[in-house]
């Protein structure tokens, strides 16, 4: 199961989150949870090709999505253990700047919701963090400083914390 949601019988409608998925065949399963309720339902699905939405699984260095400078990418941190990696490179010494935006997480404005890290690949299977910051639910837009870095391969890592409950994020590098 890639995503699960529950809708209560008294809810007139329930919207799911957007999911970034690789091309392929997917199935939607609708199941009742209560033997006493035999209600009808209507389901509306929207499928749209999008090259700037994160593609799961991008939870490791090896499966990181490629990010092109100046392009805004969107994604979703679904759980506290969800991690999204984006890979980019500097062909010469330069700088990396990442801007991340998200809607206010109501009731969690001062709570750390996400961790944003910029990581340098030093050698095969050897990585080092060059910048890390925590993002609160009320921080709707944050930017890293211009990080002066040597040429090489870099990763932008966005991770949930124990307070994360599925939030849309957008970032530009």
Located regions from the model:
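C-terminal edge strands of extracellular/lumenal beta-sandwich accessory domains
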Residues: 17, 22-67, 84-87, 108-110, ...
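Surface-exposed ligand/attachment interfaces on beta-rich extracellular proteins
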Residues: 81
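Surface-exposed beta-strand/loop patches in noncatalytic accessory domains
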Residues: 1-13, 33-35, 45, 76, ...
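Short amphipathic, basic-aromatic surface patches that mediate peripheral association
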Residues: 96-107
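Short tyrosine-centred short linear motifs in exposed loops/low-complexity segments
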Residues: 39, 92-96
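Residue-level detector of conserved, well-ordered beta-strand and adjacent loop positions
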Residues: 6, 55, 78, 89, ...
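Short coil/turn motifs at helix boundaries and re-entrant loops, enriched in small/polar
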Residues: 70
